[in-house]
Amino acid sequence: MSPPSHFDFIEARDKFTVATKNAVDTRNCKPLTTAFSHLPGNETEKKATLDQALRGVLEEQIVNQKVNVDDFLSLIYISIDGVTEGICSATTPFLLLGDVLDCLPLDQCDKIFSFVEENVSTWKSNTFYSAGKNYLLRMCNDLLRRLSKSQNTVFCGRIQLFLARLFPLSEKSGLNLQSQFNLDNITVFNKNEQDSTLGQQHTEVKEEGMDVEEGEMGDEDAPAPSSIPIDYNLYRKFWTLQDYFRNPVQCYDKFSWMTFIKYSDEALAVFKSFKLDDMQASKKKLEEMRTSSGDHVYFAKFLTSEKLMDLQLSDSNFRRHILLQYLILFQYLKGQVKFKSSSCVLNDDQSLWIEDTTKLVYQLLKEIPPDGDKFGSMVEHILNTEENWNSWKNEGCPSFVKERPAETKPIRPSRKRQAPEDFLGKGPDRKILMGNDELTRLWNLNPDNMEACKSENREFMPSLEDFFEEAIEQADPANMVEDEYKVVRNSNYGWRALRLLSRRSPHFFQPTNQQFKSLADYLENMVIKLAKELPKDIPSEEIKTGEEDDDENGDNLLKDSNDSPSIQSKAVTNSQMDEIAAKLGSQWKTLADHLEMSDKEIRVIESDSEDVDLQAKMLLVAWQDREGSQATMESLVTALNAAGFNNIADNLSET
């Protein structure tokens, strides 16, 4: 018996190289299969050698620049057939594709990628998908890095569509599981007012352009719409809104939200004041616009030149883009997102503003020609169905493919054996024997254990009258019990009293504006309320409170009552803030120091508006938002007196 022949890598590679070139010329994989079967060695060695030979032939083709793209594709087709025949590795076609795309210029890469798109069904087959999906993803990402987002927009879109067709919807690599934003999408615009040309050219353009437009208009055409007055402030505020659309989390910050509201109101006011009704005045003009425009052109990035601002605001597509951004932002702010921070919550005022503004945005969308009503209804329908997508993302993006349930044989119900007599006992009573006389007696006291637990004999919670009887007696000023000896000062008693009040008294759940420094003060207040409601047969004289006899008892806690409103609990109304802001004027910074406003907050207020009255109003609003329920009339009066505004404080106290 002859020994097995030795496998020579160099010789095998040379033979595979010759066979590969013949296969490329004949467009047939048969020379490779023949060479593979005649060479000695195991299958793994021959596969690795053939993979190396294929990449070597590709290298020669790339170095020889006379070879066209079809020759590259022929070699890749041969490798695909080789994988199908089982003579080369499943990753070889993807390695060849990656080498070709890395070495060719972009114009030829376009043709190679067309081949990749056409064979998406091949890549998704069981033979290639698991072995090549990571290679294809890496290849597409490398290609996207080489392409320009502005000049190669179509090519970039084709790559994204290919990846969407290749991977299933639940593929983790293509999902934004943590709901992250593209923070690199920064809108660049002129932020220096000194470099602005809006104020210099506005009057000249208006005077020179008006005569030309009027002279060119025909008798049948509608009158030209008036130009929208644009200054640098409107330009800056309008494009600043893009930063909020880019990163919606900013809206949860108080001062950023105030800025967003102000800028949005001004931008939407421009859309509302200057409508595009004139575009529908003439059917002839509309038809000319449709025929002359040709194919629809999509711009992936806004143009922020100051000279284009007037034209952009008069363009229906531009308005729709901006208004649609508002609706998407509002849906994110109102929606339930799994990865939102616990602090990202809207208050009632923010929710109300979003609701009103959403209605305004839909109204403006329906007023934009052409087909405004149809477009608005379509957008509303799409955003409603988007809720299903949000729910799917919150659930971790489970697969839409339902797995077949495993076929299980029906389980036979097991027979229950009867309890033995030594456990249930004998006779009509059939007591349960626990193995001990005392345990047996306790277990069989009642046939139904649940009913036994509900018995009145097991009710150990005392009544309010019995538990608070001693505390009510001590609260009577006539008994002259010092505070340190009262039972409400006992922490153990206070803990049990709170538990009893939560189970038996409705006062425990009623909100109160009165502030208590300790648990004992709170319990004394509750004792007074209970004394008025409980029966009068308690062995004590009628309870006297500090309200009835101020001279005998100076107990301030019993004197206070929550039944009547006072200046301590009054909140500052919006009209009062307007009146105070008008009186403060430019001196609002003096009050800001006594309201403990930081320098950063003051700078934000100054940058948002140049009107001193509005700045004073924003100061009071920011203080009220920060303090919440503590922003009372008393606190504001104290701050006004400390700042030296005694006249304003006196007028506020009188109201």
Swiss-Prot record:
Subcellular location, principal: nucleus
Start-end of Polar residues biased regions: 563-574
GTP-binding keyword on record: no
GO BP annotations listed: apoptotic process; mRNA export from nucleus; mRNA processing; regulation of apoptotic process; RNA splicing; signal transduction
Motif (Nuclear localization signal): 415-431
Residue span of region Disordered: 403-427, 539-574
Subunit comment: Component of the THO complex.
Stated name of the protein: THO complex subunit 1
Gene behind the chain: thoc1
